[in-house]
């Protein structure tokens, strides 16, 4: 079996908002990498056995901060790439000089490559479009570094050490705005570090299945299946690895999208022949939420009840030794870096679930090394439907945060129908994958309407569609008026409890993507 971790890159995080992008670009090239805080122990760095090290950007100023790269980084004799702050601290630690720029540079810039011989710019054109985001700049490279690229506002746009495989760039090759950023990353990782491209979906599947078999043996495993991307992919890979030793518990809250519960059972229980226990808990959730209007309270009630029901069912499974979870690499990084990270967290996630306290279960997390895009590709490799893997994000509390105020059975059914029409038409008009997220929101207010010759006094549905790269900011989707008119007409005509449809044109900020 191929050892997918044999050649790897270590990324030291100085707090840049782009650090995870660096890791994703390295992996896209086909090389495994991991992110650790910049102040991780020197012995850890020494024993990690990386083929190369990347120093991320960060929000600090080198000349008024004591945040430096660990000296061990430059003593291991392996290649180093410093990005933005990473370049500045590397140059400064080798006798160079960094000062505050007269003018901060944020946005696209043209750099001129001065030297592309056997370095990160090999086989690249003389002029390159890149993405700058910095307030400081290198003013003196010192005796050890030479300038290999420059721009109008950044005379030192890239450097190379004169005798060691150390390179630095003032711009961000990891962003898509840098036209040939992936080529720069590939030149460093493959050509300079000498990494073999072993990190691909086929090898990951083979490696994961072997690891799961070795770890689990003949033990039984329990998985909470939600129908979301992560738990679905965990179910698929565990089933391939251990077959009937896996039992999935699907808690149907009644707050899912229209027919979603049946679709989950169809894919996993019928098509893939996985042992799935479906718990119809709709009434328990409605009872628990009766009279509750506060969004945060609704979230907590839904989350706690979900865990309680899962615990009840899990306790019935005899001799289970493992609890599988859909933890992915982004969760691991956020959990590990909460204290060190300088990047500002804009919003917490709607995660529900937890480890049953009274059960002595060991944790199994087959996806903990993978980013979301890798999880989706893994799912395709395991035979899961494309539309299941590439659906828009859905909050943990489900429609509970898309019904404003109190949740009632009538409200849930009304929203499910309206939301399904919106989604169906997005697919029909090839617009679904042009937007990042689209859904309906139930407003518990009534509005007068006329359908046929009849006066109608019913509820309002708001349609929400946004375009976003990272979901930390978003713009409202400029969907065609004819399309919105069609969706509105269908909802008002087909969903009797709705008399009016409105479209949300609020960006994020100032609004959030979800209404609650």
Swiss-Prot record:
Residues 8-198 form the Glutamine amidotransferase type-1 domain. GO terms for cellular component: cytosol. Residues 199-391 form the GMPS ATP-PPase domain. Its EC number is 6.3.5.2. It catalyses: XMP + L-glutamine + ATP + H2O = GMP + L-glutamate + AMP + diphosphate + 2 H(+). The active site is at residues 84, 172, 174. Pathway: Purine metabolism; GMP biosynthesis; GMP from XMP (L-Gln route): step 1/1. Gene3D superfamilies: 3.30.300.10, 3.40.50.880, HUPs. ATP binds at residues 226-232. CDD domains: GATase1_GMP_Synthase, GMP_synthase_C. Homodimer. Catalyzes the synthesis of GMP from XMP. HAMAP family: GMP_synthase. PANTHER family: GMP SYNTHASE [GLUTAMINE-HYDROLYZING] (PTHR11922:SF2), GMP SYNTHASE-RELATED (PTHR11922). This is GMP synthase [glutamine-hydrolyzing].
């Amino acid at each position: 079996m191929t050892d997918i971790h044999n050649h790897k890159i270590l990324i030291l995080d100085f707090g840049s908002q782009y650090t995870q992008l660096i890791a994703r670009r390295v992996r896209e090239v086909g090389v495994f990498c991991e992110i650790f805080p910049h102040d991780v122990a020197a012995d850890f760095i020494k024993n990690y056995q990386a083929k190369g090290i990347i120093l991320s950007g960060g929000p600090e100023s080198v000349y008024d901060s004591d945040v430096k790269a660990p000296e061990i980084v430059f003593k291991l004799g392996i290649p180093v790439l410093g990005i933005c702050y990473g370049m500045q601290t590397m140059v400064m630690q080798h006798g160079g000089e960094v000062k505050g720029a007269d003018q901060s540079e944020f946005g696209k810039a043209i750099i001129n490559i001065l030297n592309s011989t056997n370095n990160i710019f090999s086989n690249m054109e003389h002029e390159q479009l890149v993405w700058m985001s910095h307030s400081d700049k290198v003013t003196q490279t010192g005796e050890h570094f030479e300038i290999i690229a420059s721009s109008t506002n950044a005379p030192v746009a890239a450097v190379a050490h004169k005798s060691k495989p150390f390179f630095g760039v003032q711009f961000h090759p990891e962003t898509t705005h840098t036209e040939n950023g992936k080529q720069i990353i590939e030149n460093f990782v493959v050509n300079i570090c000498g990494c073999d491209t072993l990190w691909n979906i086929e090898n990951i599947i083979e490696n994961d299945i072997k690891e799961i078999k070795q770890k689990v043996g003949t033990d039984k495993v329990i998985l909470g299946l939600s129908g979301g991307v992560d738990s679905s992919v965990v179910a698929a890979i565990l089933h391939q690895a251990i077959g009937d030793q896996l039992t999935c518990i699907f808690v149907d809250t009644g707050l899912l999208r229209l027919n979603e519960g049946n679709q989950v059972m169809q894919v996993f229980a019928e098509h893939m022949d996985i042992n799935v226990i479906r718990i119809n808990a709709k009434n328990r959730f409605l009872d628990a939420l009766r009279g509750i209007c506060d969004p945060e309270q609704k979230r907590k009630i839904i989350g706690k009840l979900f865990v309680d029901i899962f615990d009840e069912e899990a306790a019935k499974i005899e001799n289970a030794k493992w609890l599988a979870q859909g933890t992915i690499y982004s969760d691991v990084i956020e959990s590990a870096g909460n204290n060190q990270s300088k990047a500002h967290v804009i919003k917490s996630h709607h995660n529900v679930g937890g480890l049953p306290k009274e059960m002595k279960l060991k944790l199994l997390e087959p996806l903990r090394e993978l980013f979301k895009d890798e999880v989706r590709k893994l799912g395709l490799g395991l035979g899961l439907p494309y539309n299941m893997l590439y659906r828009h994000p859905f909050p943990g509390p489900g429609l509970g945060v898309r019904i404003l105020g109190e949740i009632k059975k009538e409200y849930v059914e009304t929203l499910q129908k309206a939301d399904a029409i919106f989604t169906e038409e997005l697919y029909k008009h090839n617009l679904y994958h042009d937007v990042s997220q689209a859904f309906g929101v139930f407003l518990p207010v009534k509005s007068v309407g006329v359908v046929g010759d009849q006066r109608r006094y019913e509820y309002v549905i708001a349609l929400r569609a946004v375009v976003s790269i990272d979901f930390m900011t978003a713009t409202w989707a400029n969907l065609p008026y004819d399309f919105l008119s069609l969706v509105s007409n269908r909802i008002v005509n087909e969903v009797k409890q709705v008399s009016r449809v409105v479209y949300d044109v609020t960006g994020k900020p100032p609004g959030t993507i979800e209404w609650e």
